Amino acid sequence: DDRLQYYVSGNYLNRGGLLRHGDDSMQRYTMTGKINAQITKWLRMTYNTRFSRQDFDSPGDLINGTDVFFHNMCRYWPILPTTDPNGNWLPESYIGRLQDGGRAKNQADRLAQQLSFVATPVKGLTLNAELNYRIVTQFNHRDWQTTYGYDCDNNPYVDSNATSSVYEYSFKSNYFNPNLFAEYSHSFGDHNMKVMGGFQSEWFRQRNITARQNGIMSGLPTLDTTTTKPSVGGAYNSWTTAGFFGRINYDYAGRYLFEANLRYDGSSRFLRENRWNFFPSFSAGWNIAREKFWEPLTDYVNTLKLRASWGQLGNQNTDNWYPFYPTIGFSSQGGNWLINGAKPNTASQPGLVSSTLTWE
């Protein structure tokens, strides 16, 4: 049926690492789908979806510094034995750390979806509605196990990670982006005009939680199988934008071109009185190749345009999610002195913020 087209594809990638000792691998699964449907003569729908999952698994000791591992490995003697006479791994070989020093696992899921409708109810008028949604989830697990070397009498001593530990990190973000706009074009004689106007918004939220504990008790490295108090943390961040936009295009016989754009954007990153701003742009052009005096040269140069433009676009990106809030620095047990046998919590004065901060 010409009114309905669909497409589905999948992919699997399994990539082994470079290490002979200790698994070092990456696996990726992807699925993509698309549907185009002509619902009526004047209404068309398009739906796109894409999902991917990536799994990374590597020795936990590499997380302490992959560059350091390869740096040291390249500087050892190539004839260095890997085991001692008793069959134990030599610390200089790094094999014991790779095989028994813990694991680092990372799983990331990404789902992106897009739904759009295009309507042409009357000649020259096009109505567009787009909805974009993206979600990202990530989970990291790392554990560092104590590894040992052995002296000449076969007595063990700590080689790495004197205190075993578990670290876990969970992250999730959501992004939502609706776009609604209309276009109208009309020609009369050699005059051609096109007008476009619409609304756009972005909505972003993210959250993460971290936890770490020391002293793994069993062969199952989890937060519940440790002996110390947990060290936990987390954050929640968000921002939102909204904007109205419009554009006018005009040309005369395809020779003289003019375009004007105007945006009115607002961002949650600024105070209410500085949140909104106008951003105009203009351009004018001359298509010389459309002039009659250029016809003898058309076989040699069929396109030649002169164009001049000026415009502004706003930038809300900063290194601070909420730059207009004065925040107090806080550190748990950050003091360098003892009160009742324990380090106290500390706080610092907030930095200066600008009440006039706005779009760049």
Please annotate each region the language model reported.
Residues 1-59, 70, 111-114:
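Transmembrane beta-barrel wall of Gram-negative outer-membrane proteins
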Residues 13, 65-96:
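Acidic, glycine-rich flexible loop segments
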Residues 24-25, 61-63, 297-302:
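Short, glycine-/polar-rich solvent-exposed loops and beta-turns at beta-strand/coil boundaries
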Residues 34-43, 48-53, 89-144, 156-360:
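Extracellular/periplasmic, surface-exposed regions of secreted and cell-surface proteins
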Residues 62, 68, 358:
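Glycine- and other small-residue-rich loops at beta-strand/loop junctions that grip anionic moieties
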Residues 64-65, 326:
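Short, hinge-like loop/turn segments at secondary-structure boundaries
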Residues 77-80, 150-151, 159, 259:
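Core alpha/beta catalytic barrel or barrel-like domain that forms the active/cofactor pocket
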Residues 149-152, 267:
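Extracytoplasmic gating/loop element in the C-terminal half of outer-membrane beta-barrel translocons
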